[in-house]
Amino acid sequence: MANTNKLVAPGSAAAIDQMKYEIASEFGVNLGPEATARANGSVGGEITKRLVQMAEQQLGGK
């Protein structure tokens, strides 16, 4: 299935990809087709959590 997600900031793809692999490493998850949906989902959930944290800090001026 093709990925149809459009990035709001196209230059952010590399940074998000790097974040994905850093988080996977922290969690001990080997990303790929052999990983469970739960393991891959935990990485995606943590990415979302960290991006929300970053946005809140920027909006709050911290």
From Swiss-Prot:
- Biological-process GO terms, alphabetical: DNA topological change; sporulation resulting in formation of a cellular spore
What molecular functions are annotated in GO for this chain? double-stranded DNA binding
Q: Which UniProt keywords apply?
A: DNA-binding, Sporulation
**Residues of the site described as Cleavage:** E22, I23
Superkingdom of origin organism: Bacteria
Q: List the disulfide bonds in this chain.
A: none
The cross-references to Gene3D superfamilies, in alphabetical order and at most eight, read: Small, acid-soluble spore protein, alpha/beta type-like
| PANTHER family the record matches | SMALL, ACID-SOLUBLE SPORE PROTEIN A
**What does the similarity note say?**
Belongs to the alpha/beta-type SASP family.
State the remark under miscellaneous.
SASP are degraded in the first minutes of spore germination and provide amino acids for both new protein synthesis and metabolism.
Q: What does this protein do?
A: SASP are bound to spore DNA. They are double-stranded DNA-binding proteins that cause DNA to change to an a-like conformation. They protect the DNA backbone from chemical and enzymatic cleavage and are thus involved in dormant spore's high resistance to UV light.
- Protein name in the entry: Small, acid-soluble spore protein A
**Source organism (scientific name):** Priestia megaterium
* Gene from which this protein is expressed: sasP-A
